[in-house]
Amino acid sequence: KHFKTGRPEEDYHAWTARLRREEDRPRVAWNNQWLPPNWGWESEKAAFRFYLGHFDLFGKRQWIDTLIMPKIAESKSYHIDQNGWGMDILHVGKTAGCGGVILYVNGVPYPVRNETGKGNPTFTGRVVEQTNNQLTLEFVAEGVGPENTPCTVRLRPSIGAGDLYSSVEATVDGGAPGDKIELGIGLVRLPDETFFSDRDAGIIGSWGFQDPEIGWIGMGIMFPPERFLRFDNQPEEHRVVLDCKRGEPITYNIRGDWLRGHQFPCCPSAQDWFDILIYTR
């Protein structure tokens, strides 16, 4: 028997390609309404949060492709692993978290964050680009540095479909013309951690433990090695300091990992995490 639909016969390869083509759906998302001044952004595999200069990490179960930002306000507390997809995996405290920046002016550090939400620096945010597969946000910090000659720091985090990391483009403008400026990138210290740095590869990272509710986590920052100046480790955070010129963007990547987010973790070591950072540099 034949089904006479009246349609011309379709080429078999074109037919299978059409059926196998991935559905055109959003694979990145953002939200800034659930808990101002928080901004969240994500792919199906990784999610990040920014508030007043701090960079935070969410851990996702890697065998589940999901976007959490559109309905994050409707979920239970993400500080506990109770929503199925994962949880917030980092206690940032009064630090850069994973990827916050520090502006150095004539050698003096000025963390680009605001612990109280009052005074300087002030922060604004906006969406620069959004498609189903690519997202770029922008956070502008004004009033950074010396009170009489402040700078403006512009951060543009981006993420693409399937990405396990977020790139961040940082640009500094303003200040006194004769001032020497440098840009530091911070990584919060964990109470129990193995820290790793490789100036030639352009990587700092850690594998460690902060909270029994969270378990073991990994963090990494990948920076342009040609910009490297020095490490500036502080009691609460590790820092890498980069050469910075006004108006010239510096792009670095931030990435996190959550041991419980892997279906078959196989007891990875700190070296396994560092190898991943180097391999995916």
Predicted features, each with a name:
Residues 153, 164-198:
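Acidic (Asp/Glu-rich), glycine- and aromatic
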Residues 83-160:
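Extended, loop-rich substrate-binding clefts of extracytoplasmic carbohydrate-active enzymes
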Residues 1-116:
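Solvent-exposed N-terminal domain segments of exported/luminal and surface proteins
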Residues 39-43, 139, 206:
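Short acidic-hydrophobic surface loop/beta-edge motif
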Residues 189-238:
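Accessory, usually C-terminal, subdomains that scaffold auxiliary metal cofactors
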Residues 221-281:
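Beta-strand-rich recognition/accessory modules
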Residues 138-140, 156-158, 169-171, 186, ...:
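Residue-level recognition of well-ordered beta-strand positions that form the cores
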Residues 126-133, 161-163, 173-180, 243-249:
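A short, structured loop/turn motif at beta-sheet edges
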